[in-house]
A protein has these predicted regions:
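Glycosyltransferase specificity loop/lid
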Residues: 4-75
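A short, well-ordered alpha-helix in the C-terminal region of glycosyltransferases
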Residues: 335-349
Length: 372
């Protein structure tokens, strides 16, 4: 008997693909085959994705307000649903799992129309628009947080909290305990802006470092993710005042660097928050502004409420404010240690296995021999 095939579908950014990758590893360990349906943005990440097959499904985000934009997006989603239907008929997955973003809409709708069980996973503290659209069709809704907002009526009875699946590389990095800041080692600062970078980090962090007293600045060792177009000015700024730094558009070993950090300055996407919790590192979080759902603000609040993070809205994220926060934490290293411990208390390290069990419970009985 062939191993059951599970079709995962995710938008082509790290925030959607990383938890899908973690689930794929857990499902393969349980004896399943895995395929991935995504969009063209996934090329930067798909090379390491443990899928037996990867297919590109047309999609669009209906974000415009004009009638032509809405019609164009609707037509793209309809086209994607037709292609997804053909893919599902050909591949014959036994369950389809969506990880949010509009690229998941065509495969999940197609699966529900064809009678294939579906799971959607909501990683954020507020249910996203695509998942809200799919929630009433989904067989099960898995969540990263216990009490998420924006859930449609008549859905909560099908919800289960699994946590946000974590990649093996992050779990490996989590084995390194937080060392705390001592007087004879560098103060390691990690600055990241999510999988797609964030210009505000390049605008604010280097000038903030320049404002710090020389005694603190000389102790810093900075690793900063910067967009390609911002890279030279970030490097030039740090070089100007002699701080130890490394700046690149992308770090393949980011989990290792996260584990090495004494303090992380970051956006607060769901994957980032989950990784900060599992590895257990203190952070200054700057939620992405302008999002309709304010999902990053909700994610950040979960760590702030535990004392694991300082949350700074982007309107208040100035060089002066950031310099004050860094100086205060440097001068009170026990705060960093307490925040690291608080972050770790929020972790669900086995979230991938929990979600895999939810998926495997939907596998038809003729395949049950492949389930644990």
């Amino acid at each position: 008997m062939n191993a059951p095939l599970i079709l995962l579908t995710a938008g082509g950014t790290g925030g959607h693909l990383f938890p899908a990758e973690a689930l794929a590893n857990a499902l393969k360990a349980a004896g399943c085959r895995v395929a991935l349906a995504t969009d063209k943005r996934a090329n930067a990440y798909a090379g390491s994705f443990p899928a037996d097959e990867i297919v590109e499904i047309p999609s669009a985000t209906p974000s415009g307000r004009s009638v032509p934009q809405i019609v164009k997006a609707a037509l793209m989603l309809a086209q994607g649903t037709l292609k997804a239907s053909a893919v599902i008929r050909q591949m014959k997955p036994v369950v389809v799992v969506g990880f949010g973003g509009y690229p998941t809409v065509p495969p999940v709708i197609a699966a529900s129309l064809l009678g294939v069980p579906t799971v959607i996973h909501e990683a954020n503290g507020v249910m996203g628009r695509a998942n809200r659209l799919l929630a009433r069709r989904a067989t099960v809704i898995a969540t990263g947080f216990a009490n998420i907002k924006g859930v449609p009526a008549n859905v909560p009875g099908r919800m289960v909290q699994t946590g946000n699946p974590i990649r093996p590389a992050v779990l490996e990095a989590a084995r390194q305990p937080y060392a705390g800041l001592s007087t004879d080692e560098p103060f390691r600062l990690l600055v990241v802006g999510g999988s797609q970078g964030a210009r505000v980090m390049s605008d604010v962090v280097p000038p903030a470092i320049e404002l710090l007293p020389e005694g603190i600045r000389s102790r810093l060792s900075i690793t900063q993710q910067a967009r390609g177009e911002d890279l030279e000015r970030v490097r030039a700024h740090y070089s100007k005042f002699g701080v130890t730094f490394e700046a690149e558009p992308f770090f393949k070993d980011l989990p290792h660097r996260l584990a090495q950090a004494h303090l992380v300055i970051s956006r607060s996407g769901a994957s980032t928050v989950a990784e900060l919790a599992v590895i257990g590192r203190p952070s200054i979080l700057v939620p992405l502004p302008g999002a309709l759902d304010q999902d990053q603000a909700a994610n950040a609040k979960t760590l702030e409420d535990l004392g694991a993070a300082i949350v700074c809205p982007q309107t208040e994220f100035t060089p002066e404010r950031l310099a004050r926060e860094i100086q205060s934490l440097f001068q009170q290293p026990d705060r960093l240690t307490r925040a690291a411990s608080a972050a770790h208390s929020a972790s669900i390290a086995d979230a991938a296995e929990r979600l895999a069990q939810v998926v495997l419970q939907l596998v038809p009985s003729q395949h049950n021999g492949k389930s644990p």
